[in-house]
């Protein structure tokens, strides 16, 4: 079980309350696919991912980025039990999709950069500390079935 301070809970809720899920989700997934091109192998059914421009303009990638970000709502609503909240999703990614669990961290890194850029100057050190704790528990929960 994760222990959260009132301040950490407030920080995470504040971040999510101000997110444009479509914009942040799209930008984060696009950034991940462009910066870490080997992650594209999981998106073979999403059409042309030939270069950065085609990735940025791909509506399937945009929609999936939004879906991923909305998936974080589950962790937000279940902050005290993130591990069990994502147990089924972890199983799907490990057993059926065979996603390299390190890709969760790569996407989380990209999401952090996009959120920080959007929130400037509100993405303070304290905000980042709370966010890093949240995202680290999500990444760990998603990779749980790989252990």
From Swiss-Prot:
<keyword id="KW-0813">Transport</keyword>
<dbReference type="GO" id="GO:0005344">
    <property type="term" value="F:oxygen carrier activity"/>
</dbReference>
<dbReference type="InterPro" id="IPR012292">
    <property type="entry name" value="Globin/Proto"/>
</dbReference>
<dbReference type="InterPro" id="IPR002337">
    <property type="entry name" value="Hemoglobin_b"/>
</dbReference>
<dbReference type="GO" id="GO:0005833">
    <property type="term" value="C:hemoglobin complex"/>
</dbReference>
<dbReference type="GO" id="GO:0043177">
    <property type="term" value="F:organic acid binding"/>
</dbReference>
<dbReference type="GO" id="GO:0019825">
    <property type="term" value="F:oxygen binding"/>
</dbReference>
<dbReference type="GO" id="GO:0042744">
    <property type="term" value="P:hydrogen peroxide catabolic process"/>
</dbReference>
<keyword id="KW-0408">Iron</keyword>
<dbReference type="GO" id="GO:0031720">
    <property type="term" value="F:haptoglobin binding"/>
</dbReference>
<dbReference type="InterPro" id="IPR009050">
    <property type="entry name" value="Globin-like_sf"/>
</dbReference>
<dbReference type="InterPro" id="IPR050056">
    <property type="entry name" value="Hemoglobin_oxygen_transport"/>
</dbReference>
<dbReference type="GO" id="GO:0031838">
    <property type="term" value="C:haptoglobin-hemoglobin complex"/>
</dbReference>
<keyword id="KW-0349">Heme</keyword>
<feature type="domain" description="Globin">
    <location>
        <begin position="3"/>
        <end position="147"/>
    </location>
</feature>
<dbReference type="InterPro" id="IPR000971">
    <property type="entry name" value="Globin"/>
</dbReference>
<keyword id="KW-0479">Metal-binding</keyword>
<comment type="subunit">
    <text>Heterotetramer of two alpha chains and two beta chains.</text>
</comment>
<comment type="function">
    <text>Involved in oxygen transport from gills to the various peripheral tissues.</text>
</comment>
<dbReference type="GO" id="GO:0046872">
    <property type="term" value="F:metal ion binding"/>
</dbReference>
<comment type="similarity">
    <text>Belongs to the globin family.</text>
</comment>
<keyword id="KW-0561">Oxygen transport</keyword>
<protein>
    <recommendedName>
        <fullName>Hemoglobin subunit beta</fullName>
    </recommendedName>
</protein>
<dbReference type="GO" id="GO:0020037">
    <property type="term" value="F:heme binding"/>
</dbReference>
<dbReference type="Pfam" id="PF00042">
    <property type="entry name" value="Globin"/>
</dbReference>
<dbReference type="GO" id="GO:0072562">
    <property type="term" value="C:blood microparticle"/>
</dbReference>
<feature type="binding site" description="proximal binding residue">
    <location>
        <position position="93"/>
    </location>
    <ligand>
        <name>heme b</name>
    </ligand>
</feature>
<dbReference type="GO" id="GO:0004601">
    <property type="term" value="F:peroxidase activity"/>
</dbReference>
<feature type="binding site" description="distal binding residue">
    <location>
        <position position="64"/>
    </location>
    <ligand>
        <name>heme b</name>
    </ligand>
</feature>
